[in-house]
C-alpha cells in the first residue's frame, strides 16, 4: 500500500499493519477485483487465472502495534499476522471464485512457519531460499548440505512448510547482483539444488537468474535450470554436456571449448575453497574481493587461463564471437590480476611487473570496450523507492593500485 494511512507503526520499511481491519478489507476487495478484472478481459479460472499473489515489502520492518505484537508473541514470528491476513483473503476468494489460490511469500521475516496458524486449502506458500534471521542463503553449498549452517537452517524451515501444507512453491536464487565483475561459480550447486527441490513435495520453482546485463552467464543458468525442470533425472555428465553445447553456440565451436574449460576451472576453484558465500549479495560486505574461488588455484593457473583466452580469440568465428570472448575472459583477467597483484606486481621481478602491467592495461581496455558491469547500485528515486542500475568502469587506470581496491564500488 502506498497511502500513508495503511502504514504500521514502523514506517521506515513501509510495511502495512497486517492486523488492521481496514487493510484486511482492502486486500479482500483487491483479490476479488483482480479475478473479476481478469474474467472481464477474457481470462479463465484454472487457465490464465490460477493464483493471486500477496507479498510484504522487501524488508523485515514489521508493524509493532499492540495487535501485531500479540500475534507475534503467540505465533513466535511475524509470519502469523501475515498468514492470518492471507487466510482472510483466501476465504473470501474461495467463496466467490473456487479454484483460485492466494499465494503468500515466506520470505525475509516470514520464512518461519507460525506455531498455530495454518494456511487454508486455497493458500499457496512461496518459500524463498534467501535470508533468515540475518543469514543469507549460501550458493557455494547445496540446499540440503547439513554442514552449511545457513542452508541447513533454511532447509529445515522449508521442510516444516512442506509438512504443514501440500501447496508449497519455491523461489530459488542462483544469481549475482552486487559484485558481478567476475562470474559466479554457482553451477555445481544449481545442478544439485534443482534435483533436490524436484524431489520434494512442491508445486513449482521460480528460478531467478538475473539478466545478461548483470551476469554474462545468466542465460546459461536459465537454460540449465530449464533442462533440469524438464527432467531432473539427468546425470551430472549430461548436465555439463548441455553447458558445453551452450558455450559452443554462444562463443563458437573452438572458442566455446576454451571458454568452457575456463568455466569448469572456476567451478573447481570454488569447490577447493569450500567457504560459505551468498553470490547475489556477494560484495556487499567485501567489495572488490573474491572469496568465491580459491586464490592459490587461480594464481597457479593464471598463465594457462590467459593462454585459453588468446587461443579463443585466435579461432573466433566472427566479430560478434570475438566480442563475446573478450567480455567473458575479461572477468578472468580482473580476478587473476587482483589475486596475484601483490606477488607479481608490487613484489615481483622486473619481468613479472612488465607482464602484469601489460595484462592490467589489457583488462582495463576490455572492460571499457565491452561495457562490463562491475556491480548493480541502488539509486534513490524521489522520497520513497529506489531503482537498481548497472555500474560500469569509469575510473582512470592506476597501475599502482590493485583493481580490487577501486574498480568495484560499495553498494548503498
Question: Model regions: which residues?
Answer:
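Aromatic-lined carbohydrate-binding/catalytic grooves of carbohydrate-active enzymes
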Residues: 1-11, 62-64, 168-179, 214
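Glycine-rich, aromatic-flanked loop segments that form ligand/cofactor-binding clefts
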Residues: 1-10, 46, 101, 208
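Gly/Pro-rich turn-and-neighbor structural signature
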Residues: 13-15, 20-162, 172
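Alpha-helix N-cap and loop-to-helix initiation/capping positions
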Residues: 19-22, 74-84, 146-150, 181-189, ...
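Structured mid-domain segments that build the active-site/substrate or prosthetic-cofactor binding neighborhood
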Residues: 22-25, 33, 145-264, 281, ...
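A structural motif corresponding to the C-terminal end of an alpha-helix
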Residues: 85-100, 157-168, 197-203, 304, ...
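Substrate-binding cleft/loops of secretory-pathway carbohydrate-active enzymes
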Residues: 103-134, 181-189, 214-223, 334-337, ...
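Catalytic domains of carbohydrate-active enzymes that cleave complex glycans
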Residues: 201, 228-412
Amino acid at each position: 500500500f502506498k497511502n500513508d494511512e495503511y502504514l504500521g507503526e514502523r514506517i521506515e520499511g513501509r510495511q502495512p499493519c497486517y492486523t488492521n481491519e481496514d487493510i484486511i478489507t482492502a486486500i479482500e476487495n483487491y483479490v476479488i477485483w483482480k479475478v473479476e478484472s481478469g474474467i472481464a478481459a477474457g481470462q479463465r479460472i484454472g487457465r490464465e487465472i490460477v493464483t493471486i499473489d500477496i507479498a510484504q515489502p522487501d524488508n523485515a520492518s514489521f508493524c509493532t502495534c499492540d495487535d501485531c505484537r500479540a500475534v507475534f508473541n503467540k505465533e513466535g514470528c511475524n509470519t502469523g499476522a501475515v498468514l492470518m491476513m492471507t487466510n482472510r483473503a483466501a476465504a473470501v476468494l474461495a467463496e466467490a471464485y473456487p479454484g483460485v489460490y492466494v499465494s503468500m511469500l515466506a520470505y525475509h521475516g516470514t520464512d518461519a512457519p507460525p506455531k498455530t496458524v495454518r494456511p487454508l486449502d486455497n493458500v499457496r506458500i512461496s518459500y524463498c531460499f534467501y535470508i533468515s534471521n540475518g543469514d543469507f542463503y549460501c550458493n557455494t553449498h547445496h540446499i540440503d548440505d547439513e554442514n552449511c549452517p545457513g542452508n541447513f537452517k533454511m532447509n529445515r524451515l522449508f521442510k516444516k512448510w512442506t509438512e504443514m501444507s501440500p501447496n508449497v512453491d519455491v523461489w530459488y536464487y542462483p544469481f549475482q547482483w552486487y559484485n558481478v565483475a567476475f562470474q559466479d561459480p554457482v553451477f555445481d550447486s544449481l545442478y544439485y539444488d534443482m534435483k533436490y527441490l524436484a524431489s520434494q513435495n512442491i508445486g513449482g520453482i521460480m528460478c531467478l537468474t538475473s539478466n545478461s546485463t548483470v551476469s554474462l552467464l545468466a542465460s546459461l543458468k536459465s537454460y540449465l535450470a530449464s533442462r533440469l525442470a524438464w527432467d531432473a533425472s539427468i546425470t551430472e555428465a549430461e548436465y555439463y554436456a548441455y553447458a558445453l553445447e551452450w558455450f559452443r553456440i554462444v562463443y563458437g565451436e573452438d572458442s566455446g571449448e576454451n571458454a568452457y574449460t575456463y568455466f569448469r576451472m572456476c567451478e573447481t576453484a570454488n569447490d577447493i575453497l569450500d567457504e560459505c558465500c551468498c553470490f547475489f549479495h556477494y560484495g556487499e560486505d567485501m567489495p572488490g574481493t573474491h572469496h568465491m574461488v580459491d586464490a592459490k588455484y587461480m594464481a597457479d593457473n593464471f598463465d594457462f587461463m590467459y593462454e585459453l583466452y588468446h587461443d579463443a580469440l585466435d579461432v573466433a568465428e566472427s566479430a560478434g564471437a570475438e566480442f563475446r570472448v573478450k567480455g567473458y575472459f575479461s572477468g578472468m583477467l580482473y580476478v587473476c590480476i587482483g589475486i596475484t597483484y601483490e606477488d607479481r606486481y608490487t613484489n615481483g621481478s622486473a619481468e613479472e611487473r612488465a607482464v602484469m602491467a601489460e595484462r592490467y592495461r589489457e583488462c582495463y581496455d576490455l572492460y571499457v570496450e565491452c561495457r562490463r558491469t562491475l556491480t548493480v547500485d541502488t539509486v534513490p528515486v524521489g522520497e520513497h523507492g529506489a531503482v537498481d542500475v548497472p555500474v560500469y568502469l569509469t575510473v582512470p587506470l592506476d597501475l599502482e593500485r590493485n583493481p580490487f581496491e577501486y574498480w568495484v564500488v560499495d553498494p548503498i
